[in-house]
Amino acid sequence: VTAADYAAYLSLLYGFVKGFEKNVFPLLQHSILDIEERYKTHLLVSDLKGLGIDQACIDSMPDRFFLEVYQSNAAALGGMYVLEGSILGGSIISKHLQKILGIEVITGKSNYFTAYGSETGSRWKFFLEAFCHASSGIEEEVIESALQTFSTLNQWFNRTP
């Protein structure tokens, strides 16, 4: 993994997260009460800038359209579960990047992966409580959406330019 590989990965992640937050977060404002505190696009922008990507380039990155996939609260919950769950492994990813790329390369450039810092565990527990309450009775659709989100992310990251 090189710094350029990491920047390319963050660029793709930015397109997905930005589109998800823009189009799906509004569906969750009544289910996930602290949804406003879970926006992370700005952290990806900070990471990209730290890696030398200028604002004009960031602004031109594709904004994935999600309204067709996440039309219901259940679908939005499934997608949110995947995105919030990814932060649980963030500290491991950040440590790996520091080891591979060097502390001087990654310092201040892995804000997304350490979004909640020492509060990661408590934020996850709070999310799970709200998630379990909101998904009661619609578990099948939530699970299907989570699986679809994994599939969409896989396609997003493996598409050809």
Label each region the model flagged.
Residues 1-161:
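Metal- and O2-centered redox machinery and metal/ROS homeostasis
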